[in-house]
Regions:
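Extended, charged alpha/beta regions that create polyanion-binding interfaces
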Residues: 1-57, 63-71, 77-169, 320-335
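Conserved glycine-centered short motifs in functionally critical loops
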Residues: 60, 93, 159-333
Length: 335
């Protein structure tokens, strides 16, 4: 633990989760799965081949082997189909789009991966240097809690009420302060609510792994623009890729955040494979919670059990899975 930060690694078969928690709440959840294409991970470097040049999009599509990525190009840059380029992933896939790439250098030879992006453990070391990760049952529970917090965040008692919503065009943040009976809000109260609200909004946006245009509807009017901008920089960070705008006359602060990881809601969208991974995680949690039990069995629908069986086998001889087609695909019973 360092500076109130806690780091967790849940290394359940099929999926590794890394979680960072601060005194304000969960800050990051990183997910790495068996079968993920390493060429699509943030920070991966590959030799790719340009397959299409799209002047209208100011870029080109690049074959990375198992998938394509999009390479933005300067207006006067020359590129042609078949050209080999060395590229780095600067934003992971989202909304049915492939990864966004950055040109490193011209290249030769076959399309290939040169260097995979950092693993979950490597990202945790970068984001929380020197903090020893917590593993086991507590790490599994932290992952569940972080995903729940991202979906239904709890506001601090007595603090501002902050709504953070994403549309296709932007992220909208609304900061409000619930009234206290018999007490009005003065200028200092509004300032404190806005500063605390910016911290909450920044934490939730990081946790949800969102980027793009952010519009923050601040509480009150007549804001000190310099103070608000300083508070926003403290909350969202000093990354030079973040663009901060002024507070406009309507009391709205705008900023632009770079996209990095795939949004959390996309990466955790339920399907049959995620159900199998969830089963393995629940079974692993039960095994860790009671090490005296000789046998722990998870019952689930047959379609899930077929995919889950290899993952369960990696948990050891105490773990078992049983097909039960009377159960819906969303239900798992651990016994």
């Amino acid at each position: 633990m360092s500076g109130g930060r806690r780091v967790y690694i849940d290394d359940t078969p099929g999926e590794t989760r890394g979680i960072i928690e601060s005194d304000q709440g969960f800050e990051h959840i990183l997910i790495e799965r068996d079968g993920d294409d390493p060429a699509r991970r943030l920070g991966a470097v590959s030799v790719g081949r340009i397959t299409r040049v799209e002047p209208g999009l100011s870029g080109a599509f690049v074959d990375l082997g198992r998938s394509e990525g999009f390479l933005p190009l300067p207006r006067k840059a020359s590129a042609h189909i078949g050209q080999k380029v060395e590229v780095e992933v600067v934003a992971e896939p989202r909304e049915a789009k492939g990864p966004t790439l950055r040109m490193l250098a011209p290249a030769e030879g076959e399309v290939r991966l040169i260097r995979a992006g950092p693993s979950v453990r490597e990202w945790l070391e970068r984001l929380a240097q020197g903090v020893t990760p917590i593993t086991g049952k507590a790490a599994i529970e932290a992952g569940w809690a972080a995903i729940e917090d991202a979906a239904v965040p709890a506001m601090p008692h007595g603090g501002p009420d902050v709504a953070v919503e994403r549309t296709r065009a932007m992220i909208a943040v609304d900061i409000d302060q619930p009234p206290v009976p018999g007490k009005g809000l003065n200028a200092r109260d509004r300032q404190n609510a806005n500063h605390e609200g910016l911290k909450i909004a920044a934490r939730l946006i990081r946790l949800r792994r969102w980027g793009g245009l952010v519009a923050v509807d601040l509480l009150g009017a007549g804001h000190d623009g310099a103070r608000i901008t300083a508070a926003a920089r403290a909350a969202f960070g000093g990354d030079p890729a973040i663009a901060y705008g002024p507070v406009n006359r309507f009391g709205v602060l705008q900023l632009v955040l770079p996209w990095t990881f795939t949004p959390l809601e996309e990466q955790t969208r339920p399907d049959i494979e995620s159900a199998a991974r969830d089963l393995a995680r629940k079974l692993n949690h039960a095994l860790l919670a009671d090490t005296t039990r000789a046998r722990v069995t998870a019952r689930c629908h047959g379609d899930i059990s077929k995919i889950a069986a290899p993952l369960v086998a990696r948990l050891g001889p105490r773990a078992h899975v049983m097909a039960d087609d009377s159960l819906p695909p969303t239900q798992v019973i651990v016994e």
